[in-house]
Each structure stands twice: as C-alpha cells, then as structure tokens.
Amino acid sequence: MSQANHNDTHNNIDDNINNHFNDSESLDTLDISASDNIDDEVLDGFYHREQLLSVMMATLDYIDERVKKGLILPYFDDIDTEQWQEKIKALDIYITDEDEGRELNLEARQKDYATNILSYPSDLPAAIIGLMPTLPLGELVICHAVMVREAAEQNKAAVQHINHLLVHGILHLLGFDHELGQAEQDEMERFEIEILAGLNIPNPYN
C-alpha cells in the first residue's frame, strides 16, 4: 500500500470520526505508550490519540445503550448499571514490535508467535472500582508489524485495521470472547460490525 493511499483513506476516516468526537467533550481517558523499538514516526503516523479516543468512545456508547437494555458485561457484571454509566472509563494502549509481541503472546496465551492485539483486563473487584474516580478497562497491546502485515494481506488501510482491532480489543476487556463458541463469536462480530458502521467504516469481515 502506498503512503499516498494510506493518507487519503486516513483523512476520509478522520473526517467521519471527527463528526462523532470533540476532545473537549470527552471525559474518558486514553493513554498511549510504546516500546523503545517503535519510532515516533510510527506513533505519529498511525496512532493518533484523537482518532483512537473517538473509536473508544463510540464503542462504549454502543455498549452503554445495550447495557441499558439488559446486556451483561462478563467482566463487570458485579457493577450496577448506574455506576457503569457514571464512571469515567480509562484505557491504556501499548504499541510494540514483533519480538516483544511474540514474548507477550507466549507468556499470556502460550502461543509462540506475535499476534495483532492482546487484551489485559483490569480484573479489579467492584468494591475497589467503587472507590476510584475512573473505571480502568485494562490494557491493549498492539503489535505494529503484525497489524501492518494483516492490513496489506486484507487489502485495507492500516487505519481501518487499527480501528477494528481497537473495537475488538475493548470488547475483550469487557469480557466478550469469540473463542468460547459460535454464538459468542457471532455476537462479538455483530457488535464490531455495528460499531464500525457507526463510524462509516466498512464491515471488516467482508
């Protein structure tokens, strides 16, 4: 994929995302960090905070609407709906290279290869969360090299793939897991498709 194509697509998606997002109106918090092996040019070129925060907010807005209608969040099922709705959400994103990505995947999942994204839920009890000003969702680790390779293989812009991975990862942090069975996979994919559609991002599974 050429840099020009990447930038053109990136600008189109940014326009759609900006319609959904105003940083001054955001209470949710997002922290982005990276391995020492990830250049600043990579962070600046691919991982724009405003873009990622907007996708985070769109995902949580979508989930909030379904929580109101009775959706259970597996990892936050001991937190009442009102508390979930009122708490400011916090998310950490860490960008890494393929070597560290492989090490982390081996440690976390006993898989000896780098994967596109790993999710580390906060796992805090409701009693502790109730005392905190923010509700920590956990941490997502994105392997940049794998993300870029997959985007090229799937013939999609890197920014589209990043947005999809972020939605996918947040759903994992909430306790949704496509590996539990076909019904869980179908539910999670439906959520992803609908969230991305709200940002004018095409179905990632087509």
Swiss-Prot record:
Presence of the UniProt keyword rRNA-binding in the record: no
Gene Ontology biological process terms in this record: rRNA processing
GO cellular component, one term: cytoplasm
Intracellular or extracellular location(s): Cytoplasm
Binding site for Zn(2+): H168, H172, H178
Cofactor stoichiometry and binding remark: Binds 1 zinc ion.
Keyword Nuclease: yes
EC numbers for this chain: 3.1.-.-
Keywords recorded for this protein, A-Z: Cytoplasm, Endonuclease, Hydrolase, Metal-binding, Nuclease, Ribosome biogenesis, rRNA processing, Zinc
Coiled-coil region: none
UniProt cross-references to Gene3D superfamilies, sorted A to Z: Metalloproteases ('zincins'), catalytic domain
Co-factor(s): Zn(2+)
SUPFAM superfamilies named among the record's database cross-references: Metalloproteases ('zincins'), catalytic domain
GO molecular function: metalloendopeptidase activity; RNA endonuclease activity; zinc ion binding
Main location: cytoplasm
Region (Disordered): 1-20
Domain of life from the UniProt record: Bacteria
Entries under InterPro entries matching the protein: MetalPrtase_cat_dom_sf_prd (IPR023091), YbeY (IPR002036), YbeY_CS (IPR020549)
NCBIfam families: rRNA maturation RNase YbeY
Family the entry assigns: Belongs to the endoribonuclease YbeY family.
Chain's role: Single strand-specific metallo-endoribonuclease involved in late-stage 70S ribosome quality control and in maturation of the 3' terminus of the 16S rRNA.
UniProt-recorded name of the protein: Endoribonuclease YbeY
